Amino acid sequence: MFRKMRRAEKKAIPNEEAIRLLQESKRGVLAVTGDDDYPYAVPVNYYYDAAAGKIYFHSSLAGHKVDAMKRNPKICFTVYGEPEIKDLDWAPYVKSAVVFGKAQPVADPEKKRVVLKTFAMKYYPNEAEADEEIELD
């Protein structure tokens, strides 16, 4: 279904490291099929639910990204770590996790509230600020 990484034995990181990147990174790049089938990639905040194996994005209900996902739910999402330069090498090494999937909105209001609260706790320093932001949403 998906191409194998070229030279994967030298470049691929273990799944555990990819999951750690998804759990620890604050932002990633979401790529969708945009207008006239041009790729459209945009930095986004997200929350990774490791137990469910799902990635949640927060978004407005309208706009280029949302319209694109409604037309074609296939997406690609990438997160990456800090560059590291190894001894005697000129190029930085960057660990990344690339995830393919299909986007769908969270329809159930209670599920949406729970996901939004967990999402907010990732970005806000305390629960009161997270609750305040959710109320504004």
Regions found by a protein language model. Give the residues of each.
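Extreme N-terminal tail/first-helix region
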Residues: M1-Q23
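Charged, gly/pro-rich active-site loop segments
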Residues: F2-E9, I85-D137
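A generic structural signal for nonpolar/aromatic side chains embedded in well-ordered alpha-helices
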Residues: L22, A68-M69, F119
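Generic structural signal for secondary-structure transition and capping sites
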Residues: K26-R27, K74, Y124, A128
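Short, solvent-exposed aromatic-acidic interface loops
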Residues: S59-H64, A120
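A short, polar/proline- and glycine-enriched secondary-structure boundary/capping micro-motif
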Residues: K65-R71, L88-D89
